[in-house]
From Swiss-Prot:
Belongs to the LOT5 family. It comes from the Eukaryota. This is Protein LOT5. GO terms for cellular component: cytoplasm; nucleus. Keywords: Cytoplasm, Nucleus. The keyword Calcium does not apply. It is found in: Cytoplasm; Nucleus.
Length: 252
């Protein structure tokens, strides 16, 4: 079984990584498993990290973030080392003003509860990728939500096709090519669970909507989602019908 959370010693670079907009223009149908280059949806080098475990010699004050099609990377700028988190390991991700909250599967590297915050004083990462994509924390959160959704749908399609035909599916359902046809920053991600009302929770910029519940996590209120499929996903005017999996939630 592949390790879902692991230490890495090389960060994404311009040689092995392309922006999602460039990928959309050349290859509108996303195959998460068989691309020879990483696809980057959001990144930035002005962040800090806190976690519920001892990070040993790692300095969490200055980190860079990379949201790729394959995984989410936290890069420790002062240590020149990173932690790669596979999307199936992310149980919950939430946004609270200037913080991203992650609950990930049990591991021996970075702990299970992670908070990422903006840090304008973070040490500069000289990676040229940041000249192409330098994202705000809200964009990072939206990118994690979007790619997590792709992986959830891909996993379910693999299961469904294997159950019917006896062979694994290689690609995401074709409906997701419509999702890939627009720029991520225009994401309008809305949904409604069975036990929720019609109230929509808006991001600070008033653009993005999320349906969910409030849950007290002991130190703050966070709007977020669990890994799931929604019945409909509206992505910049393109509507794609997706199969239903886990419900979307908002922490109280």
């Amino acid at each position: 079984m592949n390790q879902l959370v692991k230490l890495i010693h090389e960060q994404p670079n311009v040689e092995n990584t392309i922006p999602h907009t460039l990928y959309q223009a050349s290859s509108p149908k996303l195959n998460l498993a068989e691309e020879d280059k990483f696809i980057i949806y959001a990144s930035g080098d002005k962040f800090s990290l806190s976690t519920n475990t001892d990070l040993s010699d790692l300095n969490p004050v200055s980190v860079s973030l990379f949201v790729l099609n394959t995984n989410f990377i936290v890069w420790f700028n002062r240590n020149n080392v990173g932690i790669e988190i596979a999307y199936p390991a992310i149980i919950f991700h939430g946004l609270n003003e200037d913080s991203i909250y992650l609950n990930i599967e049990d591991n021996q590297i970075i702990g299970t509860y992670i908070t990422i915050r903006c840090n304008p004083e973070s040490q500069n990462n000289q990676n040229p990728l940041f000249n192409i994509i330098d994202s705000k924390i809200t964009n990072v959160y939206e990118a994690i939500s979007y790619v997590s959704e792709l992986h959830a749908v891909s996993s379910d399609d693999d299961y469904d096709e294997g159950e019917v035909t006896g062979i694994p599916a290689l690609e995401i359902s074709h409906t997701n090519s419509e999702l890939e046809s627009s720029v991520l920053n225009s994401l309008n991600n809305s949904g409604q669970a069975d036990d929720l009302d019609d109230n929509m929770i808006n991001d600070n910029d008033g653009i993005h909507n999320v349906a969910g519940m409030h849950v007290d996590v002991g130190f703050t209120s966070i709007a977020g989602v669990k890994t799931r499929r929604s019945e409909q996903e509206d992505y910049n005017g393109w509507t794609a019908n997706l199969n239903s999996t886990n419900k979307r939630n908002k922490l109280h």
